[in-house]
Amino acid sequence: MLVFTGDINLTDWYFNAGFGIGTRIANGFDPFRKLERNANDLWVGNFEGVASNVTDNGGFAGEVFRVHPKVLQNLNHFDVYGFANNHAMQHGKEAYQQTFNAICGYGSKCFGTNKQKSVVMKHQGRTVSFTGMCLRIDDFTDEPSYWYNPEYKEIEKELKSLPVDAFKVLYIHWGNEYINRPSSAQKKFAHWLIDIGFDLIIGMHPHVLQGYEEYNGKYIFQVSQVDKYNVTT
């Protein structure tokens, strides 16, 4: 079983600095401890936050949306994480790379960066690929280290690099916040992604559910922060 979630943030936010989830994790809390996870499941999420001991920001801005990587070391992490989202670069390029290295170092597979747009793996005898991109404006940098707003030809090129027999999943950070339905542009783009060969689209960012659509026998989901969808490949 493939189990998908949306954005996962393990840091304190602006409004709960000092008592948010990042602080609780630093004090020994594991937010994943009660998840019902079976041995044959593959859990996938989008890592939206920063785990680094460096930041380009000063003062309060340097503390929020960031935890020390050691804080996350003992969590019961997801199997696979995407790293293409509009908060990933909030503390700079070095912090982004530290985050990626730390999470991958703790045993999770990672995707969605400029250097590693996709990851391919075997699951229950089936080849599965995960590709990540972000279409949201990045307020923190003009040169994101994640796969940002690619051209159609770049997407087609990445798709062609994946194994022909793979079940191809696309994680895409997009959409308007707090709007409970996708835009016509999102729908059109998602249909094109299915038409060129992706098997499943998992969208996130708006902070609310935007429903799902079956298109040509394949599915397009718009998930929120911790929503869960099970898919049997």
Description of each model-found segment:
Residues 74-76, 103, 161-162, 193:
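Generic structural signal for hydrophobic
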